[in-house]
Amino acid sequence: MKISVVINTYNASKLLAQTLESVKDFDEILVCDMESTDNTLDIAREYGCKIVTFPKKDYTIVEPARDFAIHAASNPWVLVVDADEKVTSELREYLYHYIEQPDHDDALFIHRKNMFLGKWIKGSYPDSQLRFMDQTKATWPTTIHSHPIIDGTVGHMPKDVKYALVHAGFSVSNQILKMDVYTEEDLAKRQQESVSFTQLIFAPLWRFIKYYFIDGAILDGKAGFIKAYFSANMKFYYLAKVYERQVSKKHS
């Protein structure tokens, strides 16, 4: 059986070539582009990718294009890869072997090896993502960080890191930009109505303690500390926006 790799892109030229190099041995590479203005499509053409376009409109996240992308693939089995991820040869071989088994599931959670500032943030592992599926049985919701809905059974990859997607992760600058985007989307998705002063103080603090000490980022040196601090800031920014909306409603 054949497998299509599906990659959603928007101005993804920085790391796209190394991603495409890592998936060149799959049967098909489909790039679903949201009207990039850089040379993303030039790189995709160099690798012989099938290219489809999803209108950018005012979207700030990729999820609205996910369902369109997976169903544009030529093969039922699809592996969804982000433009800043790499697929190991061990993962590729495992997936091809897996779909030949008579008792396989209809989708698989795949683990991610998250890199930050050149270091593997081990505390974030396995960071499981539902990325391998029979697209004829999948529907992908448009909300941020959503997983596809599978009309069938779902399994998990072995936790051995050699089978993980390698995620390059964000630079510090991109991390800061993404915090604003993600908190705006979470604000719309969760519809939290109010926040207390206690939450403003202790929820970000607990997020830092959990990420840094409990999840093990303390073992990842300066990169782990910075990543934990970003995680706490993300929580604080979200709660601050909830409070901003709370105040706005009182005065409207």
Task: Annotate each PLM feature.
Residues 2-4, 28:
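Cell-envelope/extracellular polymer assembly enzymes that use nucleotide-activated donors
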Residues 41-74:
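Conserved donor nucleotide-binding strand/loop of the catalytic core
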Residues 78:
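Short aromatic/hydrophobic "clamp" motif used to bind/position activated sugar donors
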Residues 63-64, 70, 81, 88-248:
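Catalytic-site signature of metal-activated, phosphate-bearing donor transferases
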